[in-house]
């Protein structure tokens, strides 16, 4: 029965036909400029072991939070031989784990943060800055195992650091559960272009340009770091230069100077750095470790490598006299002593105090009869040397209660920044106070007649384009990364959104007063009326194409006020491009189609949804400024599949006519029929997108096109309706 098997040259006849590792060239390596549509198809049921019916938000509501809290408190002082706790307390380790999970967040695109449990996966689990955090997660495994599906890794990682602070005496601000785990690394997050860990700023693939301009949206200063280099810029100590890096990095995490000092000091009030050994003896990081290391990395298999002999950052020592308790010792030592540069046993730069009193020295992690010098990193010295940071540090030193409260609030912000609105918070310790950075929205109304509102809108004289564009612009700000933006709140009528160039303020000045008047008359929120107007426009466009439809609608959006809106905080949501409306504010290094892909991923759309939405928006005449690029139809304003029919028709040719401009002409006469942009033509050029375009161009697909367009449109309008989930 095996006679048909031929000689395979010693290779397995089955396995070597599959791309089972990354050692073989992929399509992206063969064609590196191809669109990476995989970023639109992540975290679905094929990778999620929980099944389609599992709802984490429901499951975590059944969690016994008090029992978990008791277990975490007990864990902090239950030292394990395989990874002993410093001074018998794991608090510093757990806090660093939580810090480094939450600290990947960046405000520019909302990506990163503690909300997904991504610290379990590459590349984050193997970054140099996360050395030995694999041990922290293994220490937590018994609790994750015990509480099972009621407790996500993401919530546990965030909660462990919070309880660690509580166990050491800090009154925390609160905590919310509700972070749902992902099951594979994110494919969409850009961490930088460097090809080596900790590449210096003069690296050929550096994230820096000019004097020291950090590439957007990055916040970390080096590949593999969470924040700044603790030894100094490119490893060269200079507290004032480090202060510059700190200010940029923390501002890109949505933190001001006071929050920055509080977080730096509060993070270093407890725990220690580890560099008492030879860093070259550490084994590879988890992703490169041997099979029998079972996911653990940085193992020292030639020396003891644990306890007082642990090597992590290479810096060695504690910041404070009592590293297992919350106090004001950080500022007391930093401000009252002079400090000098020294090298750690591992060869890292660190600052040590001159002529320190014996009683101010922390004790050894294993032997309390031994006292050792405390240390400061270059980042700590920046809190003393930078004038603005120094002023804040002095205030915190003089007012420990104010420092503790400021830190507790900043820690809460750090660990919850990517969770979205407060309505997503779950658990008994959710703070009652509404915070401006949470983008609060009042409760909406449902006690009105949506059909009566639609009738008023239809009679208002607004055009299909005006209604659809206004609804789209209101909703397109949504970011699935940190759950910000969206149509709920109707902030398109407030600063800064009403003045954004991409929202065409002149059009808004005409349309919004009409819709606001209808909202007042009907008792509906303006947010609901804006969405209803878009729905009316689509229904009218479908009717013009000979199809009667009703676009689904769910009332209940609220209207935010100016007092509820952080103008500066919302500035990062401003669209500088929108492929769906065929608009670029200016020319960018990144191609228009890549920008559209990035926006699509943030909005939570799939590649087929992106395709059908672009095709529909074009024929509805929703281009920015009324341009006709990509409007491949003679029936503008009617919801037809003409965009796809004409894009795939071989009777036309496509020729460049300028930067990001093409002419579509008759193949035989040469007569120019339409113009288009790269964003239009990519749906005929990219093999995957063309496959979707061909589906919608088929003779039997107009009804499917309309159904799919309406479904995708409704998804965008409801993206921030967490109450509907």
Curated annotation (Swiss-Prot):
Binds 1 heme b (iron(II)-protoporphyrin IX) group per dimer. Its cofactor is heme b. It catalyses: H2O2 + AH2 = A + 2 H2O; 2 H2O2 = O2 + 2 H2O. The keyword Oxidoreductase applies. GO terms for biological process: cellular response to hydrogen peroxide; hydrogen peroxide catabolic process. GO terms for cellular component: cytosol. Keywords: Heme, Hydrogen peroxide, Iron, Metal-binding, Oxidoreductase, Peroxidase. Its EC number is 1.11.1.21. It comes from the Bacteria. The active site is at 100 (proton acceptor). Pfam families: peroxidase. It is an enzyme of class 1 (oxidoreductase). Belongs to the peroxidase family. Peroxidase/catalase subfamily. Homodimer or homotetramer. This is Catalase-peroxidase. It comes from Picosynechococcus sp. (strain ATCC 27264 / PCC 7002 / PR-6). The gene is katG.
